[in-house]
Amino acid sequence: MWSFYVFSVLYFIGGVRSAIDERLKDDFFHIYKNAAIETRDIQNRPVTEDQVTFYLYTNENPKEFTAIDSNNLERFRNFTNQIVFLIHGWTNSRKSEWLENMKNAFLVRDKNSFVIIVDWEDPANQLYYVSSINTYDVGKFIAKLLVNLYKNYGVDKRNFLIVGHSLGGQVAGFIGKQFKKQTLQSLPRIIALDPAGPLFTTRPLNERLNKDDADVVEVVHTNGGTFGFLDACGTIDFFVNGGSSQPGCKRIDLADLVGSVQEPLLCDHRRSWAYFTEALLNPTEMVAQKCNSWAEYKISYCDKVTVPMGDLNTTLTGSFYLKTNKEPPYSKKLSSGFSLSRLISY
């Protein structure tokens, strides 16, 4: 519970980015980064490679996993199908329900794919500001596996797909940076599901998820300004229901934080993976429309460019908006009303 209060205070500090200049942002970032590292050292809990583990699932037996490391990668040699890496967020582990559901969705979507659930439970279950710093090392260790598969086992980089939620979305950014640093090649696609915002909004670009971390950086925003990153930070950003709060989730004042409200407080944040799992299973639904803002989307003052959120091949760029239902199925038909932008152009 203490870590939850710390998280809330640090979020407030990190959220004043509009009131401080870039130099102050950098100063704040380095202060908290050094404090987090010192806390980690005092606790004698540095991130080690054995704290980042990998669990492979295939359609041969989708309920059973194979733990993999550098000693048993032969089955990946010259593998030509998609390899999906799923990465959890703060205080989670590989046993998180959303990972199981999304793993199954990917295996249904592509029966020949491999899905690897990444577990970084110990580094993720520390004070939030320490776990936020741990994302760099976790990303580095995951990237090491990808580079090994790419350089030594003939896996085409185009087969890699990285999906992360919350702090896992920020981990995904560090994977992309490290892969590019070690291979001089970009990963094809990163999908960040409501990537963590607190203590990342004030970071320089090289210290957080950004659009240069892969050829396509797809971001799904559902709780921006609270637990998620508020602003566009990918090559394509989906702002679901405006990107900050979700229908069907209870509105709670942060001043009322007590143990009993932690679950509903996280509802908006968790909708990102619920929406994306549904989009995977229904790839022609969850259609979003390109628009300059949520306000303009609501009055149909938008371009006619649309894309389903479950399109894993899109190279479209920009900000896209969509509405959902309060409960599953979340997909809502895109309005067929007239476009004010087209009307005004006549």
Which residue stretches match the model-derived regions?
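Flexible, membrane-associating and regulatory peripheral segments of lipid-active enzymes
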Residues: 2-117, 123-134, 144-157, 182-185, ...
